[in-house]
Amino acid sequence: MNAQQTKLARQLAETELRIRSIYVATYIPRECGIATFTKDLTNAINILNPHHLADIVTLDDEALGGDHIDYPWEVKYKIDQNNLKSYLAAADYINQSGADVVSIQHEFGIFGGKSGEYVIPFVESIKKPLVLTFHTVLPSPSDQQKDIMQRISAKAAAIVVMVQTASDRLIDVYGVDAKKIVVIPHGIPDITFGPTEPHKELLGYDGQSLISGFGLLSRGKGYEYAIEAMRDVVTNHPNARLLILGQTHPVVLRNEGEKYRQSLKRLIKKYGLERNVELVNRYLSLSEIVGFLQATDIYVTPFPGLDQITSGTLAYAIGAGKACIATPYLFAQEVLADNRGLLVRPGDAKDLAEKINYLLDHPRKRLEIARNAYAYARNMIWPNVALRYLELFGIITGK
C-alpha cells in the first residue's frame, strides 16, 4: 500500500461513526410493541456501528413476572418500573458508563408512577446527551401528562417523532422547541413485494381472500367492527376470511383476562362466521408476521381511538405492499394519503364492509394502492431508519 492509499484508508476510517449508546426501553422477550421496536432498531444500528454495540437499560414490570424474564446479553441493567429508587440507581449507572448518548423510548404506560411520572427524576438525573423518541403525543393531555412531556423535552438534546403531525402537536400543544424535533419514520423489515397465492398455499388458505390484522389484542383494536363488517363481506365474497392475529396484551390479561377475546368469539358465533373469522391466539415471531402479511389481500386497523401517532402494525403492512383500510387516526391519515390506502369512519361496520368489498371487487385498484404504499414505505426499512438515528446521534455528540 503506497502513501496515498494509506492516507485514503485513514481518511475513510475517520469517517466511521463510532458512537457508544445506551437505550432505555422495554425489551424482548417482554411482549410489548416498544420492546420489539427497540430490538429491531438496535439490531439495525449495530450493523452500521459495529465497534460499539448497543447497551440496553430495560424497564421491567415485576407484576408481569419481569423478575423472571431471561433477557439477552445486551441488557446491562434492569429498572423496576414501579420503584422510584430503581430509576435513580439506573441514572447513576448511565452517568458512570462510557456512553456518548442515551436514547429513551417514551410511552406513558411503560414508566412507573401516575401517568409515568417516574420518568421525570430519571431524565433530570442523567448527565449524558439525551435523545427522546415519543411514541404517544396526546392532543388533549392532562395537566400532569403535559408537565411530564414538557419537563423531559426540556432536558433532551433532540426529540424524535414518527410523523409530521406529532411534530406539529409537540410545538402547538406542549410548546416544545421546534429546533429539537426531527421526524424519523417507524422502522419496518424489508419485505419482498409479490403475489399472495404462494404464501396462502403455505399457510393453508389457498383460494381464499384474506383480510387480516395483527398485534397484541386489546379493546382499542376495534376488531368487533371488523367482525360485524364480515357479515356483509361474506354475502358478496363467501371465500373471504378475517384473520385476527396475536395473543392478548399481557397487561390486559392481568387486569381482565380474556374478556375481550371471549366477546369477539361470541360475536363470531352470533353472526355465524365460524368459517370466515379466525382468532390466532399466540405471540407471533417476525417470520410468522411476515408470512401472514405476504398472504394478506387487505389489511385492516379499525381503531376506534383517533389520537394514535404511530402504529407498528400498519407500518409493517404498508411495508409489505398491502392495500390497507384504517380509521383516520393520525398515523393512518399521513401514511395512507395520496392513494396509499382507504380510510373509514370509526365504529362504522357498514362503511368498513363497503371498503373491503370495493377492494375485493376491484383487484386492479387494490394492486395500485398496494404498489403506492410499498413505494412510500421504502424509506422506512430498518437500515434507512437506523442510519437516520445514527446520524442524529453523531450530530448530538459532535462525532
Language model: regions and residue ranges:
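Carbohydrate-associated surface elements
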Residues: 165, 187, 248
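A conserved mid-protein helix/loop that constitutes part of the nucleotide-sugar donor-binding site
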Residues: 36, 117, 218-232, 350
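Nucleotide-activated donor-binding/catalytic signature segment of Leloir-type glycosyltransferases, i.e.
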Residues: 256-283, 287
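A short, well-ordered alpha-helix in the C-terminal region of glycosyltransferases
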Residues: 351, 358, 365-379, 391
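Short hydrophobic beta-strand element within catalytic cores of glycosyltransferases
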Residues: 300, 318-319, 323-327
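Conserved donor-binding/catalytic core segment of Leloir-type glycosyltransferases
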Residues: 23, 204-221, 227-230, 242-245
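A short helix/loop element that forms part of the nucleotide-sugar donor recognition site in Leloir-type
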Residues: 193-205, 210, 264
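Conserved acidic donor-binding segment of nucleotide-sugar-dependent glycosyltransferases
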Residues: 338, 342-349, 358-364
